[in-house]
């Protein structure tokens, strides 16, 4: 069975293997053992309650419970930008006009922004390509909403997610090539690695301080502003169906979109509800896939089951209860995995 659980120190080797499969561009999952080890430690300290809010971050792994193999990772930062500035570009407009000459130009412009300071962030989502099947990607992404719903007071009012921008298989980023490289004088992969390993001071030191007219960028760079990497398109669609929207903020490195939503308006959080579990054989029938999660902070578990999403009493097998760290009579959180498609 596939189960989501908190990261553990013993997961380091598995995370290093995952990091080696990302192909670059996933800043928060560098193939660097020291960085990943520190990330695990920070997550454990977050659960232990020893870190200030500005440093808190939860990390979860997707595990195949029979073998203990780690096949995916996802994370939540509690509040971004409270220690180091959290940058993105806001895509706006500057108007240049002259009535006398009958000239009016509305020019798209990039403004450096820290507008999302203090927001919670969904990040570090990666699933081993060999395991991209049977709803694993949905489980990995949406399990975080179950955790946020159960422990709502630990997160802020808004949640954001930076989507991976357009980068080709060689690591070439049109946006970086046309803009970032001119200010940072390094390749995209180098800047990405420095950022991922916590060496972020160079951003504040070298960032352009004034608005950038996008017309000055290459046509290729202009075309990818707010666009996602082809492999990231499904993840964007998943979040948009949960209520996330693009409000004209993009990543400073690759131009990928930042999606955002009020936490309490996220569908899976808003519609999740508590039910009592019982042990037995689930009723037969063609039931939809649902997310189920326990309500245990330190021993959080989440998995997919097929059941009636409106049931008042959830029947699980002994094996499912064991994986969820639950007993009959316990309370669990339940929500339909995907929103129902509206029919005309």
Curated annotation (Swiss-Prot):
Recorded GO MF terms: arginine N-succinyltransferase activity
Name under which the protein is recorded: Arginine N-succinyltransferase
Signal sequence extent: none
Record-linked PANTHER family: ARGININE N-SUCCINYLTRANSFERASE, N-SUCCINYLARGININE DIHYDROLASE
Pfam family, one: AstA
Gene that produces this protein: astA
Pathway: Amino-acid degradation; L-arginine degradation via AST pathway; L-glutamate and succinate from L-arginine: step 1/5
Catalytic reaction equation(s): succinyl-CoA + L-arginine = N(2)-succinyl-L-arginine + CoA + H(+)
Taxonomic lineage from the root: Bacteria, Pseudomonadati, Pseudomonadota, Gammaproteobacteria, Enterobacterales
Protein's UniProt keywords contain Repeat: no
Keyword Acyltransferase: yes
EC number from the UniProt entry: 2.3.1.109
Keywords tagged on the record: Acyltransferase, Arginine metabolism, Transferase
Active site, UniProt feature: 229
Chain positions recorded as succinyl-CoA binding sites: 125
NCBIfam families for the chain: arg_catab_AOST (TIGR03243), arg_catab_AstA (TIGR03244), PRK10456.1 (NF007770)
